[in-house]
Amino acid sequence: MKSLLICLVLLELVWLGNGQSRDHQPLAPAFFVFGDSLVDSGNNNYIPTLARANYFPYGIDFGFPTGRFCNGRTVVDYGATYLGLPLVPPYLSPLSIGQNALRGVNYASAAAGILDETGRHYGARTTFNGQISQFEITIELRLRRFFQNPADLRKYLAKSIIGINIGSNDYINNYLMPERYSTSQTYSGEDYADLLIKTLSAQISRLYNLGARKMVLAGSGPLGCIPSQLSMVTGNNTSGCVTKINNMVSMFNSRLKDLANTLNTTLPGSFFVYQNVFDLFHDMVVNPSRYGLVVSNEACCGNGRYGGALTCLPLQQPCLDRNQYVFWDAFHPTETANKIIAHNTFSKSANYSYPISVYELAKL
């Protein structure tokens, strides 16, 4: 317990002391993050689940394990920095209580998906529906008291950036696991993508009704290129990825972009940005040298073929040249890869965000 308290104090110093410019006002008042292990900053540390990253070597370049599924920072950590905000504390952490919540809260939970059933074999996780409920609690019990009237709170929420990175687990921890889930027997690839988008649309409407207006929808990456999927097949195409899986994800992503367009015209006062993570990350895998990377088909910390048969274990020694790897473990990018993704999706010069960059969204 004592060591946990020490870690929490250290985390507070990091969150409050990093990421926010001292010379300039932030571009947005707050950054609220929803999603899965790609952006979880430690929520799963507080629940009974197998989906945890609270052990070394996770966090090796952060200073200590924080619960992030990475050697260092995630893409939303860098995203917060681009917005001029401190790193966003996890909802279940004591650090998200009080004035800290005014700069944003991270609700993301490893193994979570759009569908409530997704990831259930890991044990507890906060589904996307559950995360939205936590957002509602945040508004009512943690934020409302800081505003003199409801109009000020509505203005604050409307100016805040809402980041949504969800959907990957609905494939790798649901549809692509026929021994555990029936979705692949029930739905074709296209029908499943339709189901995900229909469900997601209703969830986004909940966020809108709670006051969210500026929302960033991150597309799923090329899941057919991650080490865990490569380790399970004997034949890959010339790009080094599993084409069938990438085609499934592309069905979801194309519909997600269409959803952003639709919501921009049907939800008054809202603005949606779609982040084309798939094409960016696929290019990083196929042309790593273009981004200063070297190894793009093997995990820095993993076991078996491509380091993807069994993910990074406690106290396992990771690769030493982590800044040359695209993948940290069997599923997740390295800090270096996350930094590249954030630059191309959050920064002023981002060229993988549609129809505008997150920087421009925040300035609206």
From Swiss-Prot:
Subcellular location: Secreted
Official protein name in the record: GDSL esterase/lipase 7
Family: Belongs to the 'GDSL' lipolytic enzyme family.
Record-level GO BP terms: lipid catabolic process
Main localization of the protein described in the UniProt heading: secreted
GO CC entries: extracellular region
GO MF annotation terms: lipase activity
Annotated catalytic residues: 37 (nucleophile), 329, 332
Entry keyword set: Glycoprotein, Hydrolase, Lipid degradation, Lipid metabolism, Secreted, Signal
Statement: the UniProt record of this protein carries the keyword Cell inner membrane: no
Catalytic activity, EC: 3.1.1.-
Span of the signal peptide: 1-19
Tree of life domain: Eukaryota
Organism, scientific name: Arabidopsis thaliana
Pfam families given in the database record: Lipase_GDSL
Glycosylation sites: 236-237, 264, 351
